[in-house]
Amino acid sequence: MNWEMVIGLEVHIQLSTKSKLFSTSATKYGQHQNTQAAFLDLGLPGTLPVVNKEAIRKAVIFGLAVDAKISKDSFFARKNYFYPDLSKGYQISQSTNPIVQEGRLEIETSKGLKTIRIERAHLEEDAGKSVHGYIAGETGLDYNRAGTPLLEIVTYPDFRSAEEVVAYLKKLHQLVKHLGICDGNMQEGSFRCDVNLSIRPQGQAKFGTRAELKNINSFRFIDKAIEYEYARQVSVLESGGEVVQETRLYDADANETRSMRAKEDAFDYRYFPDPDLLPLVITDEYIESIKKQMPLKSEEREAVYREHLAEQEVEFLLSNLEIADYYDKVAVVIGYKPAYNWITVDLISTLNRAEKEFSSDVVPAEILLEIIANVQKDIISQANAKKVIAEYIDAPSAIEAIIEKLGLKQVSDEGMIRELVQGIIAANPQQAADFKAGKTKLMSFFVGQAMKASKGKANPKQVNQIVQEELNK
């Protein structure tokens, strides 16, 4: 029998806010345990939630980016279940009428373009974290993560292969980073995916019983987990068994999924409106104000890049949002290709030598443009621009002052350069004779000698021109 794979996804993205969804605690990753947990996050009595306005804004941005409906009235609900890292005994989430509804995202597969329907995206708070092994024989609880704002993005069961799932997740990952609503760090849990997978005989309309796969933190592992679970379910059904509705964990080391617990249905959580939170009212004026501030859609940006850059260059920029934003600021002044070369060849290579990560704050785009302007005005050479960048990275100061300090100002005095070139030709009569006899490659020898004699300060364009004039006399 031929079996068809049917998959729906639930992706949790941590929104990039400075404070939590309902408390003022910070959301910085990697801090000492329980140092970023307010009374509300710990579930202490007498505390009340206050909605983080920035989380609302970021949810609306996402909804607009996927052409979804933004709910004018949405509600927060209590999702009730018991787990040690859920201090209140319930999670504040959204059930009916979530903030984002009915969106779509187009993906590219080996069979062509496919539209994936997004059923909903709702706001909810993250849970804390159980810590094993910190205290011998005990499990600790760290509530730093509790209350961190999440946007859970739920698709319809539109996927029919692992390839489609990975293509969607990569596109979504790129989108949320591009929008600036999530840093997309999968290792730190900022972008997490649950896979709901079932199988059915080819051509059957009715869905099979699904299993939910958790604990998948890379695109490669998602592909492997899906293929394993598909094969497992086929084996179960073909041997006469029944697939159980359950949650399964993926073990990357063993490349297998293992049963974790029975999978709950919505009614098991006993959702009811949170009495401490008013309905969330979003006006048309608010939505319009956000539309005006939104960046180009990633598809629009990609189309512009592909007009001017090679495939590899486009992929590099699209996978590095901060660099792409920086690039856009430089490209609008000096052009697409020159901007790419300056950023990758001059700036990033200099940062690498200084053992520094790229950040738009280290050498702001305005500073790089000032350095480029000095090259264009023949004040410094292209080669010496890297020295200026390196000095700025080490000790930021005015670019003019750095050029003076390093003595990099080019000599553009024609008389001085001509005298220098004439002296070099006179000192190398054999090479000059060979040049006149047809060995034109010796031109670079004389240019190199002139640049060396001037300690790199002579204007290279003028040196080239004057060497040619003097040798052809």
Curated annotation (Swiss-Prot):
Keywords noted in UniProt: ATP-binding, Ligase, Nucleotide-binding, Protein biosynthesis
Catalytic activity: L-glutamyl-tRNA(Gln) + L-glutamine + ATP + H2O = L-glutaminyl-tRNA(Gln) + L-glutamate + ADP + phosphate + H(+); L-aspartyl-tRNA(Asn) + L-glutamine + ATP + H2O = L-asparaginyl-tRNA(Asn) + L-glutamate + ADP + phosphate + 2 H(+)
GTP-binding recorded as keyword: no
Positions of disulphide bridges: none
Single GO BP term: translation
Enzyme Commission number(s) of this protein: 6.3.5.-
Class of enzymatic activity (EC top level): ligase
Gene Ontology MF annotations: asparaginyl-tRNA synthase (glutamine-hydrolyzing) activity; ATP binding; glutaminyl-tRNA synthase (glutamine-hydrolyzing) activity
Pfam family, one: GatB_Yqey
UniProt record similarity statement: Belongs to the GatB/GatE family. GatB subfamily.
SUBUNIT field: Heterotrimer of A, B and C subunits.
Xref: NCBIfam families: gatB, PRK05477.1-2, PRK05477.1-4
Task performed by this protein: Allows the formation of correctly charged Asn-tRNA(Asn) or Gln-tRNA(Gln) through the transamidation of misacylated Asp-tRNA(Asn) or Glu-tRNA(Gln) in organisms which lack either or both of asparaginyl-tRNA or glutaminyl-tRNA synthetases. The reaction takes place in the presence of glutamine and ATP through an activated phospho-Asp-tRNA(Asn) or phospho-Glu-tRNA(Gln).
The protein, known as: Aspartyl/glutamyl-tRNA(Asn/Gln) amidotransferase subunit B
